[in-house]
Amino acid sequence: MAKNDQKIGWIGMGRMGTPMAERLLKAGYDVSIWNRTRSKAEPLAAKGGKVVDKLADLAGVDVLFSIVSTGKDLKEVYFGKHGVVTGRNGGLPKVFVDCSTIAVEDSADIRTRLKELGVDFVAAPVSGNAKVIKAGRLSAVLSG
């Protein structure tokens, strides 16, 4: 498979995030991965993923995907003390794409905060399961 030029970042290696990131790796993307529990991210290193130690290590990617449990969790990984935005040393991803299912108000707040930094935010909650993802049939509803 030809290597794709875009650098992708991924936050969240749960039952949905892992197979979603794995499909990007199979498609030839350069994917850097962070998960709160590092051991959940490590299996993707064997498939070509780069497991990073800090969220701020994802600040240099082109597109950052996330899929976490709550809006509070998402704000923490983006804007928390050691988040992608606050912990960075330099640039930011051009686009943040969140695949979590969170409150509309949380998405709106995040979009506003990122827009102030000149960054685009796409809310893209997904519907399906790991089997659907592996078959390439995941559904997403995008806004932003």
Task: Locate predicted features.
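Short, glycine/charged-enriched secondary-structure capping and boundary segments
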Residues: 23-26, 46-48, 78-82, 110-114, ...
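Rossmann-fold NAD(P) dinucleotide-binding segment
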Residues: 55-122
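Active-site-adjacent beta-strand anchor residues
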Residues: 34, 67, 100, 142-143
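Short alpha-helix boundary/capping motifs
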Residues: 52, 72-73, 142-143
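Surface-exposed loop/turn and secondary-structure junction residues enriched for glycine/proline
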Residues: 14-16, 61, 80-82, 87-88, ...
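Rossmann-fold dinucleotide-binding core
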Residues: 8, 101-144
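NAD(P)+-binding Rossmann beta1-loop-alpha1 motif at the extreme N-terminus of oxidoreductases
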Residues: 1-66, 94-95, 130-133
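A generic "binding-loop/recognition-motif" signal
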Residues: 37, 70, 126
